[in-house]
Regions:
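Active-site bordering "gate/hinge" segments
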Residues: 1-207
Length: 207
């Protein structure tokens, strides 16, 4: 299953055992725990402390983005971004807009008694634009996201900003000229420039 599951890690000395289960049911969890313990067994028995909740450390709201915007509202937002991008310049030929959201709930139980949960929303919006001029086609993308719901893209006109930025970059690419190529002198100072030289040609020469 790619929607739910549990992982177990057992550590004993320098040995570590891993096991997982696609089912969040007690028999499956006990079986995974036994498998991980058998892998890491080192001749000693560990003890399990009484569970206690970890302190509250909220970094972002525990929202479910999948339920906070209807399908019709999502389609309307995508259409707005398509319209915004095409309105920027007549050279825009194609607009590809995507909207994605994830809602994960994690529970971590440690043998020292720590019991911690994390509700993790994640949203992403991306706009790709293809522009054409005199038979030349160029494309560019812009987007953003964060651990919030889809309302994040409506704040401060963020989503429309992605569309405008994608168009701007595509138009810059239309006017871009090829970088000079061929042999040319390169002067490098001591220290970090050697790293640049290594990364630029060293790996290729080594292979």
């Amino acid at each position: 299953s790619i929607e739910q599951g549990a992982g177990v890690r057992a550590i004993s000395g320098d040995k570590t055992g891993f096991a997982y289960s696609d089912e969040i049911m007690m028999p499956a969890l006990l079986q995974a725990s036994s498998a991980a313990r058998a892998i890491a067994r080192h001749g000693n028995e560990g003890t399990l402390q009484a569970w206690h909740a970890s302190g509250d450390n909220t970094l972002y709201p525990a929202l479910d983005p999948l339920e906070r915007m209807t399908a019709a509202e999502k389609v309307a937002l995508l259409q707005q971004l398509d319209t915004e991008a095409r309105a920027q310049d007549a050279r825009v030929r194609e607009v590809i807009v995507s909207l994605a959201g994830v809602h994960e709930i994690m529970l971590v139980a440690v043998s020292d008694g720590t019991l911690a949960a994390d509700v993790r929303p994640l949203v992403r919006c991306n706009v790709t634009v293809i522009a054409e001029q005199d038979g030349r086609r160029e494309q560019a993308s812009s987007g953003g996201g964060g651990r919030s719901d889809y309302g994040f893209f409506l704040e401060e006109d963020r989503a429309r900003g992605y569309a405008r930025e994608a168009v701007r970059q595509a138009l810059v690419n239309l006017e871009a000229v090829a970088a000079p190529a061929g042999s040319m002198p390169v002067v490098l100072g001591p220290g970090w420039p050697g790293i640049l030289l290594h990364e630029a040609i060293g790996h290729g020469l080594r292979s």
